[in-house]
Amino acid sequence: MLPIKRLRDWFVADALPVWLEKGYDRQNQSFHERLNFDFTPITCDGKRVLVQARQVYTYSFFANSIDGASDAAQSAFEFMYTKCRHPTGGWRHRVTREGAPLDDSRDLYDQAFAVFAGAMAYRATGREEALAVAVDTLEYIEAERAHPAGGYTELVSADGSVHEGLRRQNPHMHLFEAVLALFEVTGDDSFLQRAERLYELTRSKLIVDNTLREYFTDTLEPAPGYLGEIVEPGHHMEWVWLLHRYAKVTKTPAATVLAGTLYDFVLAYGYDARTGGLYDELTTRGELHCSHRRLWPQTEALKAHVARLEHTSDDLAEARITDGISNLFKYHLIGVPGSWREHIRQGGENFYGCYPASSLYHLAFAVGELERIGNGD
C-alpha cells in the first residue's frame, strides 16, 4: 500500500496552514515570496506574478481541505489581475509588496503561469473572468511573442525591446502544461491545438539525442559550450508526466514512447545511489554536473512515477513512489512542522537560507496526483 496519507497529512495539516497564516499578506491580500526560518515574511524584493499564480493554483486545488484557502486564492488572483498586468499586454515580472510596478519586463515563464492560474481559478470557481485572463494572455503570447524559428520569445524588457539571449525549454514546458489544463477545463479544441504545436516543438527541437536540453540558440539549436550539454533530471521527470498526460488526451502513442526515453535516462543516471535523491544537473552523457538536490525535482519524480504506474506496465513504479516519499521525509520534510529543506548538498546539509513560496506548487501537484490515484480516480 502506498504511503500517500503520510505525505498528504503533512501537506494539509502542516504546510498549507503555515503558508496561509504566515505566508499570506493580509494587508495586501496576496502571498509573500519567501519566509525566513522563523516564518516571518521576506518582503524586501516585492512579489513576482509567478508566485501569485502558483499560490492561486495551490489554494484553489486544496480549497476544500483548509478553511480560508478559497478566499486566499481568489484574492491573490485579484491582486494579480489589478496589480500585475502590463498596460500593453501580458504580465509584468515583479511588483512591490503593495502592488506598484517594480520590474516591467515580461518573461515568457511568467506569462505561462498566468495562463495556468487563469485555468485553475476557472476550474475552482467557474468565473468567466478567470477564463478570460487565460485566453487574453494566450492571445498576447501568440500575437506578440511568436518566434520565427519556433516557440516564443524569452523576454521583453521594460523598455519594450526583445531580449536576444539564450532561449530556454522551461517556459515552453509550462506553457504546454497551461494549455493542456485549459483544454481539460473547457473542452475547447483550440487549446489542444496549441498543445499539439508545443509537443511538436519539444519532440523536434527541445529533445536532442534522447535528452531534454535546457538552453538554446536563437534558432533552437543546443547552446554552444557547456550550457548546451546541461540536462536537469527534474525537468525530465516533469516532462514525463506531461507527455503521458498529453498521450492520454490525444491518443498519441509516440508521446508515451518519448516519455519512456526521458524516464529511462533519469533512472540510469539521475539518482544518487547512496541517498536515493534526484540530482540537480547532469551532462547529456549522464555524467554528474551538480550533486546538490533541490526539493522540487523530488516531487516531480513522484509525479513521473505516478504516470508510469498508470499508463505503462512498469511494475517497479509503485516501489519508486514509496521510496520517493520516504526520501522526502528523510532529507527534505524535516524540522519545524510545515517547513522543508529547499536545497541540500550531497550529504544532506541544507544551504538554502529561507522557504520559497514557489516550492509549494510542486508539493501541491505531487500530493494531488498521489491522492488522485489513491482514490482510484
Regions found by a protein language model. Give the residues of each.
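Glycan-recognition and catalytic cores of secretory/periplasmic carbohydrate-active enzymes
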Residues: M1-D377
